[in-house]
Amino acid sequence: HEVVGVTMRLWGGESDTGCCSVSDVDDARRVAQQLGIDHLVFNFSDDFNKHVVDPYVQAHVDGLTPNPCIECNRHLKFDRLSERARLLGFDAVATGHHARIEKDDEGTLRLARGADDAKDQSYVVHMLDQNELEFTMFPVGHLTKAQVRDRAVELGLRTATKPDSQDVCFISKTGGRETFLGNRIPFRPARVVNEDGSEAGSVEALELVTIGQRKGLGLPGGGPKQYVVDVDTPNARITVGDESKLFCQSVVVNDIVWSSETDVERLRVNNDVLVQSSAHGVALPATVEVLTESEIRLNWLVPQRRIAPGQSVVLYNVTNSYVLAGGIACSDSEKVSLS
């Protein structure tokens, strides 16, 4: 392949997370020079604010727990960047994600897990459909992270020992999420109540609270551990309970993106799947009810901790080798108590 290096300029502010800073652009340019290839910089900062930063802020206002890195992949890397690449006449976009693209016996392209289990990123690129998979390459997906670094050392690349990027690029390690959101929205105080409605505590920022949270709730010390089991955003009320109240039997997931249209009908017949709800979480067994082509209900084989509304939920085949679909958790269909 004839290769051209590309860096997307996304976040205009400072970044100390190892991604999207001015120094990262400079690193990419210098690596391209070492490799003897051209290097382009595309300024997608307006798109990044529109599709990633602004929705991230609004999600917190709405009481959701968003995943901005997934939205960046959805709207920037595999939409705007691919669109620009096609306009410039390129045959494919290659990224450094630890995932693989394989073809099954029926000729369907499959987004498979990366060879390095600890670094697998199929969860964060789950939104790729057949057209996007056809235009995408993951050249390091068959390698471990250690092998990638070894190869970079062999080539003498200046970034060979550069630390992995961490966390959300526009949230600084020093200021954190509280400072970022506090500069953009007014925080709302909220009551913290027990399940019987009695007062338990209070918080100064409802927007910073998520399902399963245990600290920062203004609760008296010395008692049993209490967790956030419900966030009532319109009424500015947070309900806490013991850990058993966090478990549910099922969850509704909407905004579903199918890897292949054939998977919709297959899951109506054979509905066993494995489900992952965080970037490095364990895939857990469930069955699927296809409610519409864009909404499903997942029924856990064993009750599981609730998935915070707004989080991405990804379905894998029963051997846990490739992605079937993914969407956004919107509600618990049936809560259970383990007590």
Each language-model region and where it sits:
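AMP-forming adenylation/ATP pyrophosphatase catalytic core
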Residues: 1, 12, 94-101, 108-339
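ATP-dependent adenylation/nucleotidyltransferase module used to activate substrates
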Residues: 1-126, 137, 145-147, 228, ...
